[in-house]
Amino acid sequence: MSRIVEDTQRVPATLAGARLDQAAAELFSDYSRERLKAWINAGELTVDGVQAKPKAKLHGDEVLALQATIEDDTRFEAQDIALDVVYEDDTVMVINKAAGMVVHPAAGNPDGTLLNALLHHHSALAEVPRAGIVHRLDKDTTGLMMVAKTVPAQTALVAQLQARSVSRQYDAVVIGKPVSGNTIDAPIGRHPKDRKRQAVTTSGKPAVTHFRVVERFRAHTHVRCKLETGRTHQIRVHMAHARYPLIGDPLYGGRAKLPPGAAEPLKEILREFPRQALHARKLIFKHPVSGESMMFQVDLPDDLLMLLDYLREDSETMR
């Protein structure tokens, strides 16, 4: 499906000296930089009626004329997949992602993803890069994610993430008993030998995780983590680096630790917990239009509640 878009903007004095692609991003903010650059290269976005290059310098007072065809992003199929929508308005959504849901199609997961579900939920997201997704959760991590419904909203939310002004808190259940909370400041990059894994490495990107103890058990601990950065697998890598890997983590968790004398139901759940015990519980950001502070919080999912119940019962029984 396609539609024609037409718009005209005069370059203000404040953008004198700017490149054409930079000025276009300011003046036609409903469209992504990538799309605008393609239109410039195709001659569908002109300067005073003449095709120019994206890097062309502007002097001010030029007329930028847009006449282009928008093709909806049909690379990915809209699929009727249930979403737990916590909040939604005209520009932003907050969802509670289920375990097992991949965020974006990739090799091995061509469909059935959050992106496919979002395209079905709101068809206009086909015009927003990545269907409005601005950050990710791992496949088996549950909890809160924000989604932009317009390009300007996406730009604003990404800027907040880059400025580290978005607050993201996670609950995790780890192997071991940290004495107290701590801050882990260690760079993360791709593992040198295993492409599926990340690792703490001097060549990695800066990564900072704060955690505090919520509840201690005989051999495990419920912790609450707060991210300053958003590296791939960050909490999982950092907690494993600190020697407190997450229960159930297939990449970083290692062998299950069974408390001495533990009852069979606890042994079973510790051996067979099907995913990393990690949940994005709280999300705070500024609304991309109003600037209002938005705070959302969701309860732990049933599988983590059951795990904590078994650990708590074991601790109380074996006192």
Provide a role label for each language-model segment.
Residues S2-R319:
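RNA pseudouridine synthases
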